Swiss-Prot record:
It is an enzyme of class 2 (transferase). The record marks R218 as: Important for catalytic activity. A purine D-ribonucleoside binds at H5, D180, M181, E182, S204, D205. One of its GO terms (molecular function) is purine-nucleoside phosphorylase activity. The lineage of its organism: Bacteria, Pseudomonadati, Pseudomonadota, Gammaproteobacteria, Enterobacterales. This is Purine nucleoside phosphorylase DeoD-type.
Amino acid sequence: MPTLHIKSEKNAFSNIVLMPGDPVRAKYIAENYLANPVQINDTRLMLAYTGYYKNKKISVMSHGMGIPSASLYVRELILEYNVKKIIRVGTCGTIQNNIKLRDIVISMGASTDSKINRIRFNNHDYAAIADFEMIFHAFSTAKKMNFKVHIGNFFTTDSFYTESEDMLKILKKYNIIGIDMETAGIYAVAAELKAQALSICTVSDHIIKKDAVSSKDRESSFHNMITLSLETTLLL
């Protein structure tokens, strides 16, 4: 049944949903990678589509920016639409010298400066981790397709424009491979509701080198990430 934020019919979604942050990217994925895509939501302009990838039913829906927005949509998808598996397909920054622009990074866990997981976890630190089965299949698929991927810990931040030099040094020291604004929240909601989640991202910004993929080049740069994510769904 429709929720406060998703006005789709009960069986409109697949049990596997790819979730970019940007609704325009959700539309792009549906129109360029799925067969027979049907738009199933446009409430608050959070576009959602269901179609088929190699005869497997797949949905794609945007989750917006930040943990609160992403957590809200993930929760409603799992509780009201029986979604079992979430793959975040998005962008992230990096600070590691061995990781380059357009590289694919997979988050096996995510630390955060947000308080939301502490609120959920009775003011204790929660280890927000990806589902192992999904990591395994994504890594195996990447090897089979000869895609170079980096797997490690993310840092999910509430503050997009705050770049403390001291904090960046700490993140680099602890081998954080990706910085985003959603993964820690998505992993916590999925764990709480007994679902599976994984973030597969493309590096769009190297924060220390101050280098970035241009807005014009972003869609074409993310082909491998989207293909890897879709091929992974075939094993789930």
